[in-house]
């Protein structure tokens, strides 16, 4: 069950950088100065997804009940705004290195904001990129994230919605230390130049190279930013219709696609088709994750999570921000069907 926090009087940290399409701010708890991230639902022209913050909270609760390492989200009130809140994943001596930094560090021609690069965002591109930073063993965590997304129907696992917690510490270098570092960098760049010249790529203005030049230490972060799921974009009328129309319900699930693509053409696949393809190469990992989900899945527990998720929401906010029983029923039905389809992959 999610807790409720009134963070109106907490200390806002406007100098912190936040990303994404939703209204966000960073605050610190005055009791212990711990850092939290607060965000509301998406609200812009043509897109008023009021239940979106609930999707974040529900997916977090369900994910953790099924054995996934998902960041905990709770309900929060910030002035006149209602949204979800999560505690910072990293300490002051750590930082979150987002996937986008790893992908662009691996391939300098990759431009995630350029539509022509969208098709490059594939499972194997991610695999190659993390391997280049000596993080190849973490591919299991990437697969876990993809399987988690299939359960909640998340369609927005973009490059900034996954990453690694890495050591971070500001250090002032002496002149001697700085000269030593720059000398090593100079030697490394010379090696790269020699490699390119030897392979006749240095004089090609469009040439680029992918090389393992760094070793990164760190761990895969908890799964975060998973609010684009659970039919959060559907109106109350559409929710009621989906509950009574099996064709519409099945079509909605079938249309759900992963943001992480597949193949040389970078095609977007249905969540379950993507997992089937990954399973061809990583059957032991995929089957292990799915079997663990099946062993932890308790239909009554999932229903209890969903139907009590807004129990701590104050009564004066319930009419405007509470979830209807119809929406809760649809969310439960979606989770139940998606887990069944996931189970069928390994049968």
How would you label these PLM feature ranges?
Residues 162-167:
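Hydrophobic residue at the +6 position relative to the catalytic HRD Asp in the kinase catalytic loop
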């Amino acid at each position: 069950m999610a807790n409720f926090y009134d963070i109106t009087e907490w200390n806002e940290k406007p100098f912190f950088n936040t990303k994404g399409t939703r209204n966000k701010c960073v605050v610190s708890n005055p009791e212990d100065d711990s850092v939290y991230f607060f965000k509301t639902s998406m609200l812009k022209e043509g897109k008023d997804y009021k239940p979106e913050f609930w999707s974040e909270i529900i997916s977090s609760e369900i994910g953790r009940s099924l054995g996934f390492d998902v960041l905990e989200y709770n309900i929060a009130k910030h002035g006149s705004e209602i949204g979800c809140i999560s505690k910072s994943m990293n300490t002051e001596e750590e930082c979150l290195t987002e996937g986008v930094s790893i992908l662009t560090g691996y391939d300098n021609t990759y431009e995630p904001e350029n539509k022509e690069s969208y098709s490059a965002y594939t499972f194997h591109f991610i695999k190659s990129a993390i391997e280049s930073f000596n993080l190849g063993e973490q591919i299991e965590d990437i697969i876990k994230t993809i399987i988690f997304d299939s359960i909640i129907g998340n369609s927005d696992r973009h490059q900034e919605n996954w990453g690694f917690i890495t050591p971070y510490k500001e250090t002032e270098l002496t002149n001697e230390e700085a000269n030593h570092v720059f000398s090593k960098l100079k030697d490394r760049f010379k090696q790269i130049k020699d490699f390119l010249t030897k392979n006749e790529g240095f004089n090609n203005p469009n040439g680029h190279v992918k090389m393992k030049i760094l070793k990164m230490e760190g761990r895969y972060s908890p799964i975060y930013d998973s609010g684009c799921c659970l039919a959060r974009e559907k109106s109350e009328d559409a929710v009621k219709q989906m509950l009574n129309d099996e064709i519409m319900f099945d079509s909605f699930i079938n249309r759900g696609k992963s943001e992480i693509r597949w193949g040389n053409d970078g095609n977007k696949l249905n969540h379950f088709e993507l997992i089937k393809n990954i399973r061809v190469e990583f059957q032991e990992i995929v089957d292990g994750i799915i079997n663990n989900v099946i062993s932890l899945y308790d239909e009554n527990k999932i229903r209890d999570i969903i139907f009590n998720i807004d129990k701590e929401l104050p009564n004066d906010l319930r009419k405007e921000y509470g979830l209807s029983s119809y929406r809760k029923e649809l969310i439960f039905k979606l989770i139940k069907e998606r887990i069944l389809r996931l189970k069928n992959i390994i049968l």
